[in-house]
Amino acid sequence: MSVSGKIGEVDRWIEQLSRCEPLSEEDVIQMCDLAKEVLSVESNVQSVRCPVTVCGDIHGQFHDLMELFNIGGPSPDTNYLFMGDYVDRGYHSVETVSLLIAFKIRYPQRITILRGNHESRQITQVYGFYDECLRKYGNANVWQYFTDLFDYLPLTALIEDRIFCLHGGLSPSIDTLDHVRILDRVQEVPHEGPICDLLWSDPDDRPGWGISPRGAGYTFGPDIAEAFNHNNGLDLIARAHQLVMEGYNWTTNHNVVTIFSAPNYCYRCGNQAAIMGIDDHINYAFIQYDTAPRKEELHVTRRTPDYFL
């Protein structure tokens, strides 16, 4: 199936999804097949050029994704790099992940979508995406197509050989970017090992490696990040994965930044969101924003499931 012969169809999908209307099951099947073609040729360390806008977790908050495009600029006018966690917890995971995948098919050089720890079969069965697919499609087929596609998402990206981007964090199994490049990523997120760590680990103020309270991945100290950046010629690690109240947060010695792009997370956390714009000269600036106003969902907070945050 060739992407070039399907441009008109992909444009129709984008138009429909931009109205927060889910695609038919048949369209989802076709879209996932096309996306596999595009993603399968990308590297585990996908090379990205400036200018680009870097984004963190979205978690099915579709209207806030629309606000992100409103603030950062529409695709494909702005180049985007999303660092995972498109699904679960929000009410519109199907529409959110579908739109980002459709953009990826239509503008493969303009948008990069990485894998987060929620782009997994096991996690989505617990935190909402599986149930949402059942509710919207009446069966689990669409969930199956999406989660099969998630196996193809790149694990990390490298902006101008200087800024390393990934969902979670570092791994004691990985010293160099070449160690990431040789991983076989086309699989369910494992319970342990380097792929798991890249999607689950968190920076910490304490030096060295630590046991993660999440039960997967590790915590890594400023010394670990400093050594990794030095060994790989990097200026900075940009990652997502953690709720930060102002939308972005630096580690103490400014070598790791966390970016979180789901404002008022779970429709009740009251946090700001942020995106990081990087210009042609690799200067970066953060844009913070609040949740998008939406009249039709004012009742939403009263029926938010009591997820563990």
Curated annotation (Swiss-Prot):
The protein's annotated catalytic reaction(s) are: O-phospho-L-seryl-[protein] + H2O = L-seryl-[protein] + phosphate; O-phospho-L-threonyl-[protein] + H2O = L-threonyl-[protein] + phosphate
Checking Gene3D superfamilies in the record gives: 3.60.21.10
Q: Where does Mn(2+) 1 bind?
A: D57, H59, D85
One term of GO molecular function: phosphoprotein phosphatase activity
Q: Name one Pfam family in it.
A: Metallophos
Instruction: Specify the superkingdom.
Output: Eukaryota
Report the active site residues: H118 (proton donor)
Cellular component, GO, one term: cytosol
One of the GO biological process terms: signaling
CDD domains per record: MPP_PP2A_PP4_PP6
Q: How is the cofactor bound?
A: Binds 2 manganese ions per subunit.
As for family, the record states: Belongs to the PPP phosphatase family. PP-2A subfamily.
Q: This chain belongs to which protein, by name?
A: Minor serine/threonine-protein phosphatase PP2A-1 catalytic subunit
The coding gene here is ppa1
